[in-house]
């Protein structure tokens, strides 16, 4: 049979780094989102563009006299353009973050 350790309840053991005398207000709580909101907004925007642009271009092409095959090719090309734009925007954002980290490290070394 398991023995109970004195001074530590199950709730205390479940929270790493907590001691029996700590109150909940003393514990650090990180409620920040895992992903910044501007990243979520970009993802939502590109998702909407990825859905509406190819479908819209397909129907516009068919309406103006193109065959369905040509309209499908145009829709596929537009989907690829939006995908490459998303990759480029994400790459630029990552590049800016790396440059900011390098500047912070350089500033920390100078001090």
From Swiss-Prot:
This protein's encoding gene: vma21
Keywords: Cytoplasmic vesicle, Endoplasmic reticulum, Membrane, Transmembrane, Transmembrane helix
Residue span of region Disordered: 1-32
Free-text function comment from the UniProt entry: Required for the assembly of the V0 complex of the vacuolar ATPase (V-ATPase) in the endoplasmic reticulum.
Membrane topology, Lumenal segments: 65-69
GO terms, biological process: vacuolar proton-transporting V-type ATPase complex assembly
Descriptive protein name: Vacuolar ATPase assembly integral membrane protein vma21
Organism: Emericella nidulans (strain FGSC A4 / ATCC 38163 / CBS 112.46 / NRRL 194 / M139)
Pfam assignment, any one: VMA21
Protein's cellular compartments: Endoplasmic reticulum membrane; Endoplasmic reticulum-Golgi intermediate compartment membrane; Cytoplasmic vesicle, COPII-coated vesicle membrane
Polar residues composition-biased segments: 20-32
Domain of life: Eukaryota
Keyword Oxidoreductase tagged: no
Family the UniProt entry places it in: Belongs to the VMA21 family.
GO cellular component: endoplasmic reticulum membrane; endoplasmic reticulum-Golgi intermediate compartment membrane; ER to Golgi transport vesicle membrane
């Amino acid at each position: 049979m398991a023995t109970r350790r004195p001074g530590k309840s199950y709730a205390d053991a479940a929270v790493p780094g907590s001691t029996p005398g700590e109150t909940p207000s003393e514990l650090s709580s990180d409620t920040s989102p895992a992903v910044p909101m501007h990243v979520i907004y970009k993802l939502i925007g590109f998702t909407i563009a990825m859905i509406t642009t190819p479908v819209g271009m397909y129907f516009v092409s068919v309406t103006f006299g193109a065959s369905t095959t040509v309209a499908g090719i145009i829709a596929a090309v537009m989907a690829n353009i939006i995908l490459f734009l998303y990759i480029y925007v994400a790459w630029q954002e990552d590049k800016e973050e790396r440059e900011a980290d390098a500047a912070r490290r350089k500033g920390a070394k100078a001090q």
